[in-house]
Amino acid sequence: MLKSAVRSAFYTELTATEDAYFTPVEQPFRSPSCSISASDVYPAMLRLVALLAALCAVTQGCPTILTKSQWGGRAPTCRTAMATPVTYVVIHHTEGTACSTQSACITQAKNIQNYHINSNGWCDIGYNFLVGEDGNAYEGRGWTSVGAHAPNYNSNSIGISVFGSFMNYNPNTAAQNAVKNLISCGVSRGYIKSAYILKGHRNVTATDCPGNTFYNTVRTWPRFQA
């Protein structure tokens, strides 16, 4: 929808600018005189540049992020604000069932949130975001709330967990791209430092998370530090 709106605005602006340049004068047989000043055209060109930048951001920016209200998550019982931009991004797997459709991922998100609140006694789902093999991201605590996913790092990190257990295989390409795009999105929006440090969960506490195979892949990503 957003892409369509930007394209529509772009072509409307383009048409207006073309008209400004190419509409013939009313009396074509007289000596031509241009009635268009730079002050008429220049603002239109600036708007075109802005629209092109917006279209580029939509095309290359954030993955689809379902807000907590969109996936039907419970409201948190408490919240601690997190100072941004954060230094660390910590990658997890849920060590549960993978999902490749939005409906299946929503079911998993609700199950995990219920477990974290009801069994762990936490305020909310522990992760800042979750990612499915449907290529979507699912908001957990979001960009500006301290998570409960990595001891000693929670207050200065974004925790991203992929639905599934990845000891013996990787998440699919859609999920991996969504994780990478989510990180880039956080950087571009000012929530993650451009010089962030990427870690696997096992780098900050004793665990096999995010699974052996996926961890070996994450190690090859930019800005990884064990």
Each PLM stretch: what is its role?
Residues 120-123, 133:
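Glycine-/small-residue-enriched capping loops at alpha/beta junctions
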Residues 46-50, 58-96, 132-226:
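Basic/polar, cationic surfaces and motifs that engage anionic cell-wall
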Residues 6, 14-16:
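Intrinsically disordered, low-complexity segments enriched in serine/proline and basic residues
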Residues 1-4, 30-52:
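Classical eukaryotic N-terminal signal peptides for Sec-dependent ER targeting/secretion
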Residues 83-117:
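Active-site acidic/histidine clusters and adjacent loop/turn architecture
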